[in-house]
């Protein structure tokens, strides 16, 4: 409704530089491509990128539901998706004159769907790690760095953390497959989980990012 203009962005970037603040613009990649009944712009304009086109967001009835729909994802193996996604990433980082980019990538429930002609039967951890690596490699070519939320890299079963702040669909093994240059933002709703220590022990730079309770 009220998007920032390029002039607004340049003013923000200049203020950040003046006060030695590093700015990391963010858009949601892979997951969070919809919310409830609303499909977001990427999948509206490019419906062919949808990992689960057989699931109609208009039928969303709240959580839980028969389709397992929380948020839509794009298919990381679609041959045309990264041309579009990387153009958005480059436009954003160039506009903010920054070498940091946050890709979100949290709460990815739809990945490696059985009905996806490209992802069916693929290891979910490898799919997730592959997407993280593609984005990091793209940014690294420009001297830039990727930041992501860390929840999909935590085993929700063994930790007892559960499906929202950790992974219950086996993407957690991606932690040993992604580049160590990726900066992990370790978020949790309320409880002070000790997962930042886990990420640090795995060799990643990490920041704690509490949500409801600082």
Language model: regions and residue ranges:
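Catalytic-core regions of glycoside hydrolase
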Residues: 95-97, 110, 114-214
């Amino acid at each position: 409704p009220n998007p920032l203009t390029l002039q607004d962005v340049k003013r923000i970037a200049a203020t950040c530089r003046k006060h030695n603040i590093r700015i990391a613009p963010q858009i949601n990649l892979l997951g969070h491509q919809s919310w409830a009944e609303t499909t977001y712009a990427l999948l509206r304009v490019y419906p062919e990128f949808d990992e689960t086109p057989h699931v109609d967001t208009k039928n969303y009835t709240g959580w839980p539901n028969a389709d397992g729909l929380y948020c839509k994802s794009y298919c990381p193996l679609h041959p045309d998706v990264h041309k579009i996604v990387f153009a958005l990433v480059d436009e954003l980082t160039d506009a903010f004159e920054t070498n940091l980019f946050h890709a979100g990538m949290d709460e990815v429930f739809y990945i490696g769907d059985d009905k996806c002609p490209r992802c069916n039967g693929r290891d979910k951890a490898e799919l997730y790690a592959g997407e993280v690596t593609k984005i990091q490699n793209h940014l690294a070519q420009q001297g830039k760095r990727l930041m992501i939320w860390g929840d999909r890299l935590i085993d929700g079963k063994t930790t007892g953390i559960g499906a929202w702040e950790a992974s219950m669909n086996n993407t957690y093994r991606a932690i040993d497959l992604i580049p160590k240059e990726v900066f992990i933002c370790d978020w949790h709703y309320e409880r002070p989980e000790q997962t930042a220590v886990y990420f640090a022990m795995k060799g990643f730079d990490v920041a704690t990012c509490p949500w409801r309770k600082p």
